[in-house]
């Protein structure tokens, strides 16, 4: 079989002192932490679309990427080559999972029937490669945003025919996700929203979106798909206002339509940025709701107003992200999918590897720091003390629902002074710094 990356060796762990760009400094997949290998804590995944389809095109310029599969001019030959390259890529990086959109892995035909037949051929190739590999599918999804038919949306379109097409496309995507043993299925509504309310039936669109998701739940039950359904919130881009704006908005929608028991969230760092939140905020919201399912690992540029999908290299972000994952009990049917692309000027094949290595190292280091923070309980202890007034006396009565406005007025009306604890933000931020420095110093 053709080798796509002959110049790239299998990536090894060399430790924090290594200067080799094609080696792990902090990620040792077999390092055991809390009784489990690091690779099973992190569950890294390759995003097929950014790694094997993206070619460095932007609105102002042509593709720049040098990719070995581009030697194939026939669309099917290229599709098969990308699949083969995926498995070689994952095996050299010791990544055990991948994610895809249906249209990433196979080209479209003239009709949906023809497209499905093409898709089946590529799925067979993936299944063949899986037989001799430990690479698995983390989650699948359907591309309901690229084709012009979805200009008004998919589930929220003004066309019943387009709604039907989208439903049939998701039906097929669910089938192949199940066939490939996917742990989950993601819904991202890039076109589910509006540009202006002047031409939008907001009520109908939201109701149709709920109808669409309910149909998906029912079909998954029918075919025996037991993977986790995931909503991926994003406030805007490509649509001006998207209905799954953030975790809180999407959860309210699911709750309102009785769908909350079937869905968790796939949280993307850059989407949190676009919503005006920190990555940790979205993860914390999902965690306290019991809905933290999976993560799209990347980072954005705070100076830019769009989804830059950069590889994650910010240790603060990865530490606080993994802190939330640890506090949630870790991943079950989810993981860390690198929804990230190399920069347009990072056009060499080796840059694909370097980008993933950087992200894997940064999350591995973040996990190790977060594990110490969680184990020592430093933030938990401070928070518990800060809110101690609700553990006793009148505060305990408030929490237990044993008081009311009249009783609270009677309690407080003659009190002259209320003593408040200090928030000590500066101390806690410096404590986080100390844990980062200490953890790195202790690593081999």
Swiss-Prot record:
It holds the Pfam family AP_endonuc_2. Binds 2 magnesium ions per subunit. SUPFAM superfamilies: Xylose isomerase-like. Mg(2+) 2 binds at residues 268, 271, 307, 309. Its main location: cytoplasm. It is found in: Cytoplasm. Its cofactor is Mg(2+). The active site is at residues 101, 104. It catalyses: alpha-D-xylose = alpha-D-xylulofuranose. Its EC number is 5.3.1.5. Coiled coil: none annotated. It comes from the Bacteria. Keywords: Carbohydrate metabolism, Cytoplasm, Isomerase, Magnesium, Metal-binding, Xylose metabolism. GO terms for biological process: D-xylose metabolic process. The keyword Cell cycle does not apply. Mg(2+) 1 binds at residues 232, 268, 296, 339. InterPro entries: Xyl_isomerase-like_sf (IPR036237), Xyl_isomerase-like_TIM-brl (IPR013022), Xylose_isom_bac (IPR013452), Xylose_isomerase (IPR001998). GO terms for molecular function: magnesium ion binding; xylose isomerase activity. GO terms for cellular component: cytoplasm. Belongs to the xylose isomerase family. Homotetramer. This is Xylose isomerase. It comes from Thermotoga sp. (strain RQ2). The gene is xylA.
């Amino acid at each position: 079989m053709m080798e796509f990356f002959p110049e790239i060796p299998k990536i090894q762990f060399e430790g924090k002192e290594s200067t080799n760009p094609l080696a792990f400094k902090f990620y040792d997949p077999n390092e055991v932490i809390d009784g489990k290998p690091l690779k099973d804590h992190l569950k890294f995944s390759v995003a097929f679309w950014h790694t094997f389809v993206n070619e460095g095109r932007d609105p102002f310029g042509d593709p720049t990427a040098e990719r070995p599969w581009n030697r194939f001019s026939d669309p099917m030959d290229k599709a098969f080559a990308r699949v083969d390259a995926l498995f070689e890529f994952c095996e050299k990086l010791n990544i055990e999972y991948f994610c895809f959109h249906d249209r990433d892995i196979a080209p479209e035909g003239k009709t949906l029937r023809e497209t499905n037949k093409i898709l089946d051929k590529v799925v067979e190739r993936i299944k063949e490669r899986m037989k001799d590999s430990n690479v698995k599918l983390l989650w699948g999804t359907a591309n309901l945003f690229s084709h012009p038919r979805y200009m008004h949306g998919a589930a929220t379109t003004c066309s019943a025919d387009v709604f039907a097409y989208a439903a049939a496309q998701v039906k097929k995507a669910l089938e192949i996700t199940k066939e490939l043993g996917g742990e989950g299925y993601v819904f991202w509504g890039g076109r589910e929203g509006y540009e202006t309310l002047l031409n939008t039936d907001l009520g109908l669109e939201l109701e149709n979106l709920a109808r669409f998701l309910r149909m998906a739940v029912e079909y998954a039950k029918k075919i025996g798909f037991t993977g986790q359904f995931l909503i991926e919130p994003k406030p805007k881009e490509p649509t001006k206002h998207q209905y799954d704006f953030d975790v809180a908005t999407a959860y309210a929608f699911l709750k309102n339509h009785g769908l909350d028991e079937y869905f968790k969230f796939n949280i993307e760092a850059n989407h949190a940025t676009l919503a005006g939140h920190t990555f940790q905020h979205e993860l914390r919201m999902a965690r306290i709701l019991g809905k933290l399912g999976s993560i799209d690992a990347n980072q954005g540029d705070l100076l830019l107003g769009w989804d830059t999908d950069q590889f994650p290299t910010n240790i603060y972000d990865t530490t606080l992200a993994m802190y939330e994952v640890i506090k949630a009990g870790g991943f079950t049917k989810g993981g860390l999918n690198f929804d990230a692309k190399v920069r347009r000027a990072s056009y060499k094949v080796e840059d694909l590897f370097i980008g993933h290595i950087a992200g894997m190292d940064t999350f591995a280091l973040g996990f190790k720091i977060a594990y110490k923070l969680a184990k020592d309980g430093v933030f938990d202890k401070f928070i518990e003390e800060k809110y101690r007034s609700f553990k006793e006396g009148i505060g305990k009565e408030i929490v237990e629902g044993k008081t009311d406005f009249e009783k609270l007025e009677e309690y407080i009306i003659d009190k002259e002074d209320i003593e408040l604890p200090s928030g000590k933000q500066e101390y806690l931020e410096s404590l986080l710094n100390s844990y980062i420095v200490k953890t790195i110093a202790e690593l081999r």
